[in-house]
Each structure stands twice: as C-alpha cells, then as structure tokens.
Amino acid sequence: MEGESVKPSPQPTAQAEDEEKNRRTVTVNAAHMGKAFKVMNELRSKRLLCDVMIVAEDVEVEAHRVVLAACSPYFCAMFTGDMSESKAKKIEIKDVDGQTLSKLIDYIYTAEIEVTEENVQVLLPAASLLQLMDVRQNCCDFLQSQLHPTNCLGIRAFADVHTCTDLLQQANAYAEQHFPEVMLGEEFLSLSLDQVCSLISSDKLTVSSEEKVFEAVISWINYEKETRLDHMAKLMEHVRLPLLPRDYLVQTVEEEALIKNNNTCKDFLIEAMKYHLLPLDQRLLIKNPRTKPRTPVSLPKVMIVVGGQAPKAIRSVECYDFEEGRWDQIAELPSRRCRAGVVFMAGHVYAVGGFNGSLRVRTVDVYDGVKDQWTSIASMQERRSTLGAAVLNDLLYAVGGFDGSTGLASVEAYSYKTNEWFFVAPMNTRRSSVGVGVVEGKLYAVGGYDGASRQCLSTVEQYNPATNEWIYVADMSTRRSGAGVGVLSGQLYATGGHDGPLVRKSVEVYDPGTNTWKQVADMNMCRRNAGVCAVNGLLYVVGGDDGSCNLASVEYYNPVTDKWTLLPTNMSTGRSYAGVAVIHKSL
C-alpha cells in the first residue's frame, strides 16, 4: 500500500540453496554422446549432411565440419579462421598419407584406433599435425611398451624428432639401464660420435664393470674402422679406466692395438695405472670424471623359475617380484623341459638341454623378458640333462650331465655373438647332477654323480679359461649330488643335495682365497635338485624335492646373520629340477 515501506526479500542461506538443489533433479545420460557420435558416423558413411571433403594423396574422406572442429584444434582453426579453407568444399592435407588420414578421421567419429608396429611411425606425426593429442599419447605409450635393447636408440631418435619429451626420456633411461645389451646391437654401432659420447659419459649407465664401456668403444670403432679411427681418443676420454681391475688394464687394455697406436689413449692408460699404485686414501683425493664411479638407477629385479618336474616335465615358468612379494605366470617354454641348465646372459634367460619327459635333449630356448617370449637358438653338440650351466667371459658353459646312458665329463661353450657351440677341455671326472658357479674368473664344478663308482661325489674341480684346464680343488666335507650351487660375495655355496637316499639340509661354503670349505647354517628343509640364485646380498634356494615330494617353497640365506628364512609365498606348484635366473623387471 501507498506509504508503506517494502522490505527486501531475505537472502537464501547456503543451507536453503542446498535444499533447493536437492529438490531439483539433473539427469546425465552417460550414453548420450556416444549415441550421438554413432549416428553422426552413420550419416557420414551414407554421405548425408557432409559439408567438406578432406583429401590426402588419392584418398578422399567426406565429413562434417562441426565434428572435425569439435575434436581437432587443427580443423577448428581452419574452419573458423579467415583462411580460404574455411569456406572450401574440398581441402587437401599435405604431409599425411591417405590411409593414415582416413584412420584419424575414423577416430574422430568413433574414438577407436589401433596402434601397431607397422603404423605407429606415420600415425604419431599425423596425429601431431591434426592436434589429436590422445592419439599422439597412445602412440607414445605404445612405443614405450615396445622398448627393447635392439630398438630403444631408434625410438629415442624418433621421439627427439617429434618432440615427444617423456618418450625421449624413457628411451634414453632404457638405453642407459640396458647398456650391456644395447651395445651389442646394430643401432648402437650406427650412432654418431656425439651420440656415443653422450651415452657412455652418463653417470647413470648401468654396467657391472667399466669393461663393458671399453668393449663398446672398441666395437664401435671397429665397425667402421677407417672412418672412425681418429675418434678413439675422444671416446676413451669417457671410459673410466682407473675403475677397471689392474689385471684387465694390463692383459686387455694395454694389449689393444687401438690403444697402442694412440698417444692420448696411452696417457689415459698411464693415468689409470698410476691410480692403482696410490694408497686408497690418496685415490679418494683425485677428482676427475674418469675416477668417479657411475651411479646407475637400480632397476627392480625379478626371479624366473623355468620348467622342472611337477612330477613330470612341465612347460610352466613362474616369476617372483621381489618388490611386490608375489608370483606370476609368464610365457611358457615352447616344450616340456626339466633338469636343464638355466642362466642369464646378455639380457636374456637361456634354458639349456634337459629332459622333455621322454628324451634327453640338446636344444636351447631363450627368453626375452621385454617381449615375454621364448625363441630357439643353436643346439648343443651333445644331449645333456642334469647338467650345470654358468656364464664366464660372455660365454655360456654347459658342464657334464647325463646323455641317457652315461654321465658326461665333456664341457661345451656357447657364444651368443656367433650362435655357435664348441667343446672345451673335459673335466677329470664324469659328473651328472652337478652344480656349477663362477668365482673370480674361474668355473667350478661341484659334486654330482659319476655313474661309474655308483657313488655321489664330494670332489670339486676348477676350470681356468686362460689355460683351458681343469684342476681339483678342496673336497666338500660331504658327498653331494643334486646340490644347489650359487655364488654370493665371491664365495661358492653348496646347498643340500643327497648322498644315496639321504637328502641333506646342510650347507657349506668355499673360499677360493684359502681353498677351504666351511659349514654354515642348515636350511629349514631338506632339498635336492633345487634352483639357486643370489639377489641383493641374499642367496635364494628354490623348490627341489625332499626325497618324497616336490617342494613349492623358497628360502633365502643371509650371510650377515647366518640364518635361513622361508619366503611367505610359495610357487603355484612344487618343482624339482627347475632352473632359476634373475632378470631386470620390465619397465
């Protein structure tokens, strides 16, 4: 009414607003957009309402401007700007092949695309051009999943050209972490001088010894010797010679013709020799890039358990993840295999010889952890089961074993560089069910069964590759056939095994410096025919049998506490005569 003041409406409180919202119901149909794009794609396939034709090479693709603009900033700028293409009915896209353009426009409508080894190198730059960043990322993820010692340098170069920063860093880290395998490949040998220098100068290079870096330099020079000879000094500047063992400097580096014929390289060698003559406290005072130890990023490791008897020969392969404390099944062997020799060499796991359930075999299968697949390589000269296998100086040795009728004293070696097997000196004693290990450049054959005396053996032999001779060293304290043999901190361990019907849980350790064996703590369980490996300062003994049943349990020994501890998780199946190797966990 006239003359009366009007009161302002009260402001709604936050609580009242929430209550009002709760009274309103907003329905979101998650499938709506998908249905809409499905219909738009159907219209496109029927050429209905299309208002633009995109052309690449001889491929013409009809489409809807609004759809292309909504999904691709490249097309959005083209259709909404002042360029002539904004009105054109037909638009040619250069630098993209027709098939790839068609795939990417399909993706815009369907959100589906298949990235393969065959198309990724054309798909990624085309997706970058059209600013389809999800597809570009899919391509990068695919390439990252395909990283392998044979292709990581090529992927790194590809990532660099196309400014894929994360992929570039991942490929570079992969090359550093897998350098001993990368240096064997064609991609490494084809690198430029600057690229090799950049790689071998990295503190993050993962090498067990600086020997690998020296060998890589020599290989790279020799690959194109005439044109690369002048680069020797530049490369040797990045090899940390003072960190090499003195014996290697004298026997290998000093004798290398490429070093002898280059005064600068000889100076680097003299620097290294002088470094070794200094007392330790004075060495620590020398600060230059060649005396600085590398500090690689340690890759997590996994343990691979290959084949075995359960109770018959099996194809199954299990993998134990030390970080996560769990077992997983991985790619099976191509055929049943137990009583094989299993080793890790040059980035791969080798399963050598063994028994397939009916025959002793000569065949060898190789596992690639990155691809999770097995392939076959050259077979041994002789059939061998219950053999010992070990790696020494980049050669795989197959020691002794049983050929189906007799125990073997023969030994053969395999070079992965030539894919060939050749015999070396035989042992002094026939040994089946023999355990082997490498300590300080010597190969040891421990115990076993000789078949002639019908007794298990306590004797041990040592092979020197420099003289191609076997000699006896100190006997074990007890006879052991089927002992699990492993190396930890420069000492040789013999675990369990049996003497006739008696299966042992005792363990003894050999010190090559004193040529003596001593007893350490017993295992928790009696085991023979178990697999053994050393990881992170611990010795793992895997499976085996106790004389009556196969074991799924695993236990590890800590030399600091002299104690054995059972892993809390067992393998999925009890395995005797399985082989064990440790590899880097795939990224």
UniProtKB/Swiss-Prot annotation:
PTM-bearing positions, type Phosphoserine: S376, S433
BTB domain ranges (all copies): 50-117
Region described as Disordered: spans on this chain: 1-24
Superkingdom of origin: Eukaryota
Keywords: Actin-binding, Cytoplasm, Cytoskeleton, Kelch repeat, Phosphoprotein, Repeat, Ubl conjugation pathway
CDD domains xrefs: BACK_KLHL3 (cd18513), BTB_POZ_KLHL3 (cd18339)
Domain BACK: 152-254
Pathway in which this enzyme or protein is active: Protein modification; protein ubiquitination
Chief localisation class: cytoplasm
GO MF entries: actin binding; cullin family protein binding; ubiquitin-like ligase-substrate adaptor activity
GO cellular component: Cul3-RING ubiquitin ligase complex; cytoskeleton; cytosol
Result of altering R528H: Knockin mice display a pseudohypoaldosteronism type II (PHA2)-like phenotype, characterized by low-renin hypertension, hyperkalemia with reduced renal potassium excretion and hyperchloremic metabolic acidosis
Modified residues (Phosphothreonine): T295, T375
Deletion consequences: Mice display pseudohypoaldosteronism type II (PHA2)-like phenotype, such as salt-sensitive hypertension. In kidney, increased level of Wnk1 and Wnk4 kinases is observed, while Wnk1 and Wnk4 levels are unchanged in other tissues.
InterPro entries per the UniProt record, alphabetical: BACK, BTB-kelch_protein, BTB/POZ_dom, Kelch-typ_b-propeller, Kelch_1, KLHL3_BACK, Quinoprot_gluc/sorb_DH_b-prop, SKP1/BTB/POZ_sf
Kelch repeats: 302-347, 348-394, 396-441, 442-490, 491-537, 539-585
Post-translational modification: Phosphorylation at Ser-433 by PKA or PKC decreases the interaction with WNK1 and WNK4, leading to inhibit their degradation by the BCR(KLHL3) complex. Phosphorylated at Ser-433 by PKC in response to angiotensin II signaling, decreasing ability to promote degradation of WNK1 and WNK4, leading to activation of Na-Cl cotransporter SLC12A3/NCC. Phosphorylation at Ser-433 is increased by insulin. Dephosphorylated at Ser-433 by calcineurin PPP3CA, promoting degradation of WNK1 and WNK4.
SUPFAM superfamilies: Kelch motif, POZ domain, Soluble quinoprotein glucose dehydrogenase
Distribution of this protein across tissues and organs: Present at high level in brain and kidney (at protein level). Weakly expressed in other tissues. In kidney, predominantly localizes to the distal convoluted tubule (DCT) and collecting duct, with apical localization in the DCT (at protein level).
Function (record text): Substrate-specific adapter of a BCR (BTB-CUL3-RBX1) E3 ubiquitin ligase complex that acts as a regulator of ion transport in the distal nephron. The BCR(KLHL3) complex acts by mediating ubiquitination and degradation of WNK1 and WNK4, two activators of Na-Cl cotransporter SLC12A3/NCC in distal convoluted tubule cells of kidney, thereby regulating NaCl reabsorption. The BCR(KLHL3) complex also mediates ubiquitination of CLDN8, a tight-junction protein required for paracellular chloride transport in the kidney, leading to its degradation.
Assembly with partners or alone: Homodimer. Component of the BCR(KLHL3) E3 ubiquitin ligase complex, at least composed of CUL3 and KLHL3 and RBX1. Interacts with CLDN8.
Family indicated by similarity: Belongs to the KLHL3 family.
Protein's recorded name: Kelch-like protein 3
Source taxonomy: Eukaryota, Metazoa, Chordata, Craniata, Vertebrata
